[in-house]
Amino acid sequence: MFLIVGLGNPGSKYDNTRHNIGFEVIDNISNEYNIDINRQKFKGVYGEGFIANNKVILLKPTTYMNLSGDSVREVANFYKISNENIIVIYDDISLDIGRLRIREKGSAGGHNGIKSIIANLSTDVFPRIKVGVGQPNDNLVDYVLGKFSKEEKEVLKESIEAATNSVEEIIKQDINSAMNKFNGFKANKSI
């Protein structure tokens, strides 16, 4: 069983913001694999289904970003999911829009959602898919809570699709296969 987590902040005012790209990828996975995200529990909204004949749980924590680990820990403990089978998808300001980076472990890199998950799981060993949202010119908080432009959204469609495909690759094959296949990903469209 796999737990696939998209990080973001709850509420419509955060829709289409850079910090919520994880939620957008989860929504895309939900659509592609016909998994309804309609249950509320574990400090989040979630749904259960199958990808590549493996049972998966799609989770969007509703704790706000900085407390995402509370929700992840509750689901992982309840379903007895090992850390290696927890895939976390989130925004990365160190990557250009249209890029992905997949890692099997590592530090939080300044991302408070990841910091919370590492603290709650007591390990930094869990797969993550970082979706590039570009570098801020000035205020970091304003930038990550800012909305994407129309041009950026066009490029991100490709990133979201690639992130969705990389989740399936991790589940069907393994993290190394996904890293080899997707770490060089660059959207065809650019800004």
Swiss-Prot record:
- Give GO MF terms, alphabetically: peptidyl-tRNA hydrolase activity; tRNA binding
Sites marked Discriminates between blocked and unblocked aminoacyl-tRNA:
N9
Q: Which UniProt keywords apply?
A: Cytoplasm, Hydrolase, RNA-binding, tRNA-binding
Q: What class of enzyme is it?
A: hydrolase
GO cellular component term of the entry, any: cytoplasm
What residues form the catalytic site here?
Answer: H19
| Binding-site list for tRNA | Y14, Y64, N66, N112
Show which residues form the site (Stabilizes the basic form of H active site to accept a proton).
D91
Mind telling me which Pfam families this protein's record contains? Pept_tRNA_hydro
Any one Gene Ontology BP term: rescue of stalled ribosome
Q: Where located?
A: Cytoplasm
Catalytic activity, EC: 3.1.1.29
* Reactions catalysed: an N-acyl-L-alpha-aminoacyl-tRNA + H2O = an N-acyl-L-amino acid + a tRNA + H(+)
Keyword Lyase tagged: no
- What does the UniProt record say this protein does? Hydrolyzes ribosome-free peptidyl-tRNAs (with 1 or more amino acids incorporated), which drop off the ribosome during protein synthesis, or as a result of ribosome stalling. Catalyzes the release of premature peptidyl moieties from peptidyl-tRNA molecules trapped in stalled 50S ribosomal subunits, and thus maintains levels of free tRNAs and 50S ribosomes.
Q: Which family does it belong to?
A: Belongs to the PTH family.
Q: How does it assemble?
A: Monomer.
How is this protein named in the record?
Answer: Peptidyl-tRNA hydrolase
Underlying gene? pth
